[in-house]
């Protein structure tokens, strides 16, 4: 079985650390980033199966990440998380082809299930 590559982008270190630890226990290869700029540079070097990104970050936001991912790798699934969930944010994300959308605080069990569904869609 090949190992799936997951990228997590969130400006809260605790979210990145928690996601990395939990997802690595499931056997995923996980890379985390505290802002989008180095994450997008890494995406140009390496393909990821799923990208989990915060919606609201300084500099490049989650919607810009979503557009960049879909431009580079149209079949890579993007999961968005945010502490600022509202209907407009959700609609914008869904129009941008986000796979799933979660409010913070992030529930790791839900994230794991969403990642598994995203990977199943890719098969």
Report each predicted region and the residues it spans.
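Short amphipathic alpha-helix used as the core "switch/output" element in two-component signaling
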Residues: 41, 63-74, 95
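Charged docking surfaces used in two-component/phosphorelay signaling
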Residues: 17-25
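C-terminal output helix
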Residues: 88, 106-115
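The feature encodes the CheY-like receiver
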Residues: 16, 58, 86
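Acidic catalytic/metal-coordinating carboxylates
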Residues: 34-38, 61-64
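Short hydrophobic/Thr-rich beta-strand motif most characteristic of the beta2 strand and flanking loop
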Residues: 27-34, 42
């Amino acid at each position: 079985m090949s190992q799936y590559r997951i990228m997590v982008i969130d400006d809260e270190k605790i979210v990145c650390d928690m996601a990395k630890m939990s997802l690595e226990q499931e056997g995923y290869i996980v890379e985390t980033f505290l802002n989008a700029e180095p994450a997008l540079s890494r995406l140009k070097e390496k393909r990821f199966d799923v990208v989990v990104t915060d919606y609201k970050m300084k500099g490049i936001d989650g919607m810009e990440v979503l557009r960049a991912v879909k431009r580079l790798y149209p079949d890579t699934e993007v999961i968005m998380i945010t502490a600022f969930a509202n209907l407009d944010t959700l609609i914008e994300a869904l129009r941008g082809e986000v796979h799933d959308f979660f409010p913070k605080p992030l529930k790791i069990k839900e994230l794991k299930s969403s990642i598994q569904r995203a990977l199943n869609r890719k098969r």
